[in-house]
Amino acid sequence: MLSKLPKSSKLVVIGGGIIGCSTAYHLAHMGLEVVLLERKKLTSGTTFHAAGLVGQLRTNANITQLLGYSVDLYNKLEKETGLGTGWKMNGGLRLACNNERWTEVQRQTTTAHSFGLEMDLLSPKEAQDLWPIMDISDVVGAAFLPTDGQANPSDITQALAKGARSKGATVI
């Protein structure tokens, strides 16, 4: 492995999980010289254990915007690299089973709209129409964010690494 190490690099990223590979990907796409170092195999750390759920709405507009960017990236990464990411835009459902939670879900929907996200308030029956096996006997209301989804973190990491390599990054 030491023979593969370049003598120098402008930037070195330590860790070949989704964060390290994303960092290398974006730096390489900016035209910067980058080396990514992983001590074992890509995704062999915490990325391997991640659930891969991608919910975009947060209380902070900047984080919500970053998560929206991630959704856009997952949509294009497969085309760019030829590697699957497991990305499925199947939406996210938020349930309210009491009036206090319903008020919170309504506020979240208002926040989503102010951040430019499509999020719809639903009756219990409308929520059940989306997921027919759901028992709605105690559901007061729901909200659905159609652009949320799920992905395979290991697959995304491999695609990010390939995308970084395609722009000149060295992944060791």
Segments (PLM) and residue ranges:
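Beta1/beta-strand and adjacent pyrophosphate-binding region of the FAD-binding site
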Residues: 3-19, 35
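Short, flexible hinge/linker loops that cap or flank conserved catalytic cores
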Residues: 3-6, 28, 87
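Gly/Ala-rich phosphate-binding loop of Rossmann-like dinucleotide-binding domains
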Residues: 24, 28, 163
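Glycine-rich FAD pyrophosphate-binding loop
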Residues: 28-48
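Short beta-to-alpha linker loops that shape the active-site pocket of alpha/beta-hydrolase fold enzymes
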Residues: 40-42, 127, 160
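Dinucleotide-binding Rossmann-like beta1-alpha1 core, especially the glycine-rich loop
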Residues: 52-130
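Helical element adjacent to the flavin cofactor pocket in flavoenzyme catalytic cores
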Residues: 143-172
